[in-house]
Amino acid sequence: MLCVPRHSNPSGEIYSDENLLELFRIGSQFSDKFLFLFDHAYLIHDFLPSKEQRPLWELAVEAGVEDQTVVTTSFSKVTFGGGGISFYASSGGSLDLIKKVRTTMIICPDKLNQKRHVEFFKDAQGVKDHMQRHAELVRPKFEIAYSYLEKLDEECGNFSRPTGGYFITYSTSKPVASRVVQLCKEMGVLITPAGSTFPKNYDPKDSVIRIAPTYVSKEDLEVAMEVFITAVELAHSEIDI
């Protein structure tokens, strides 16, 4: 099982400790070879007060499934995309397998890059302060996106309100997500293709659209969101279900 347990991409949920322990119970009862893969990409990416979550490894140890668990995270969304430093936790055969695969990919870590990160952050508080500055940049853009999405009639669909991460999910009430994306493109706004968050890019309901408000400037975001809500209204009015 592969999942993003905090600010889950794209809908933003934070898995509760109770649900995580239940996942561990169900998976381990199914098979002692069942593997839990956690992509903790948004571990420290809160931009609003968020639910507390115990460390995943602590929960895995409590459930007795540390040999079946792999927890990974990186600084790709903290410092440089694809150029940060990364971390993982595992145990037993799972750890042995990761070490074997990793050894065939790279001789050793980029120690200069590790040194750069240590010099920049200094300590854990330095990381927290840096992510607070991230939040101050990200939060206003989400607020802009919400202000436009709130203009849409509820019959058109609904949207998520994450407290961290980088994405908003808009779910159309009719199977028109692909049409919305097409209309946006025709009006000069490119957004993530409909279905991108599903296996093989197939959304059986054709309803889920992922919005990433952080990439563009506030000014461009306002234009893009005006285009988006117009596209949703047009697509919704074109089809009767």
Model-derived features: positions:
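Helix N-cap motif at beta-to-alpha junctions
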Residues: 173-177, 216-218
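Active-site phosphate-binding strand-loop segment of PLP-dependent enzymes
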Residues: 1-51, 239
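Generic structural signal for small/hydrophobic residues in well-ordered secondary structure
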Residues: 1-2, 72, 86, 117, ...
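PLP-dependent enzyme catalytic core of the Aspartate aminotransferase-like
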Residues: 186, 200-241
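Short, conserved active-site loop motifs that form the nucleotide-linked donor/cofactor pocket
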Residues: 34, 69, 157, 189
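A structure-centric feature marking long, well-folded core domains of fungal metabolic enzymes
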Residues: 1, 9-13, 65, 117, ...
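Conserved core segment of the aminotransferase class I/II
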Residues: 61-139
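Conserved glycine-rich beta-strand-loop-beta hairpin in the small C-terminal domain of fold type I
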Residues: 118, 132-146, 156-171, 185
